[in-house]
Amino acid sequence: MRLHTLQPAPGAKSTRKRVGRGTSSGHGKTSGFGHKGQKARSGRVGKRGFEGGQTPLYKKLPKIMRFKNYPFKIEYEVVNVEKLNRFDSGTVVDIGTLVDTGLVSSLSAKVKILGQGEITKALQVKVHAISKSAKEKIEAAGGSVEVVD
């Protein structure tokens, strides 16, 4: 062991550098803060997102944190009235029969009947949703409509 090879033990606590104690220390006069300006002042924390007075980036962007309804949106599989003509008169048309004929993909799907086309057969329709025009057309043909949940 020699004086020029001495060093602190691993994990030893080093002493804090004291600033503003003379120019020969390397951290005298301005204490590493530079000259003047916002970052040289006392209490120099700075507001989060502050960009020196110009309009900050988060104000330039659209409001991204506003309420969005997409997690609650109900997706319906659409079947038009004209497609229901393939069933015989008096048939109960529900999700199961629509899946069997391939008009709807699965039993768990929500189904909405829309009023495009004409219907000539009296059917008993049981679906999750139905448009006003579709309901009128089915009832005019002698059928009935029931909305299920």
Curated annotation (Swiss-Prot):
Q: What is the species listed in this Swiss-Prot or TrEMBL entry? A: Coprothermobacter proteolyticus (strain ATCC 35245 / DSM 5265 / OCM 4 / BT)
Sorted alphabetically, which HAMAP family does this protein's record hold? Answer: Ribosomal_uL15
Stretches the record annotates as Disordered? 1-53
Q: Where is the composition biased (Gly residues)?
A: 23-35
Biased region (Basic residues) positions are 36-47
Query: Which NCBIfam families does the annotation name?
Result: rplO_bact
Gene symbol of the encoding locus: rplO
Q: Which family does it belong to?
A: Belongs to the universal ribosomal protein uL15 family.
Keyword entries, A-Z: Ribonucleoprotein, Ribosomal protein, RNA-binding, rRNA-binding
Q: Mind telling me what this protein is named?
A: Large ribosomal subunit protein uL15
Q: What functional role does this protein have? A: Binds to the 23S rRNA.
InterPro entries assigned? Ribosomal_uL15, Ribosomal_uL15/eL18, Ribosomal_uL15/eL18_sf, Ribosomal_uL15_bac-type, Ribosomal_uL15_CS
Any one Gene Ontology cellular component term annotated for this protein: large ribosomal subunit
